Amino acid sequence: MGKQKATRVNGILKKEEQTIDDDSLKKEKQAIDDEDYDEDEDEDYDPEAKVEEEKEASDEESDHEPQPDYSSIENATFQDRLVKTRSQRHQEKYGSNAGINHIRPGLIKSDDISKNIDVDAIFNDLQRKSKSGTPDDWKASIEEEQAKTESIKYNNANSKQTTNISSADTPQEDNSLDPQKVKIESSYTFAGKVITESKLVDAGSAEAKAYFNSTKGITASNLKASAATRSFVPIIRTIPGSTEPTELRIKLKRPSLIDKFLSTYGDKKQKLSTLEKSRLDWASFVDQKKLKDDLSTHNKGGYLDKQEFLGRLQDKRDEHYQKAKEEERKRQWQSQQQQSL
């Protein structure tokens, strides 16, 4: 009997050891399978079920969170809901008679300012300085400027007359040319070819006028390029309130690279457009057929003549407007000076 019990106990112990070994092997296999497991390859895997479980867990956590109490906001009146400004909060805290300086005192006290500064003396000083520039001095300065401009105009007119007399007395260097003839030399590209022309035409002919009008911009650019460049321009002016003229040096603008390029570009050969070439051809045809007088008589009531007349009229209106504006400005200045007295 004792042997049978011993064998039974040994058999039970062996079975328990085998079950323990089997459990350990199963756990190791499960760990290996978990490492090699891919959720995407599993046909029974449902991602939506996992998301629903996470939502349920978050809902359970949110149920345990404390809810805010909005009863005070719902029961508040309209005035309590309004946002109060800084001054209103300050009045509630310190009273209606308290100022902002109670919170933010300045670096300088008001008592020291009232003791050290004499407001009456400053006012009298400013009033005395404003009365120093009288309208009589202003009128005198304006009259001096007008006298200077008139004297400059008179000297320029005399110099022009003397130059005209001297040019009339001197003999002409080139006697071969008629004084009423003008030599036109033009070199231009037309239709892909370089064409050079030189002819003698009357100074008052339509072709000469058309040529001078077409080359006006080119000659003006050449003259500007040939002029000497200066860094400043001296201007002498009299300041109101003082009799001595003062020299003002106005600084000129430095020429840019584009201006230099344009000045060199003007030295190239003249290029006429189709419109300018047709204008020159028409002017030469008018001179050959002697149609200038007939065209001038028939075009008096034409569209171009009317446009020129309206343009001259508008220029005169602009001049009168500028003069009236300057006179009104002077009158207002004089009235302000008289009122200050």
From Swiss-Prot:
Biased composition (Basic and acidic residues): 13-32, 134-151, 316-331
Top-level lineage group: Eukaryota
InterPro entries xrefs: BCNT-C, Swc5/CFDP1/2
Region annotated Disordered, chain positions: 1-104, 125-180, 316-341
Residue intervals of the BCNT-C domain: 252-331
Keyword field contains Thylakoid: no
Composition skew (Acidic residues), residue ranges: 33-46, 54-63
Biological-process GO terms, alphabetical: chromatin organization
Compartments, record wording: Nucleus
Key words, A-Z: Activator, Chromatin regulator, Nucleus, Transcription, Transcription regulation
Record has Ubl conjugation as a keyword: no
GO cellular component: a single term: Swr1 complex
Biased amino acid composition, Polar residues: 69-78, 152-170
Known function: Component of the SWR1 complex which mediates the ATP-dependent exchange of histone H2A for the H2A variant HZT1 leading to transcriptional regulation of selected genes by chromatin remodeling. Involved in chromosome stability.
PANTHER family assigned: CRANIOFACIAL DEVELOPMENT PROTEIN 1
Protein name (database record): SWR1-complex protein 5
Upper lineage: Eukaryota, Fungi, Dikarya, Ascomycota, Saccharomycotina
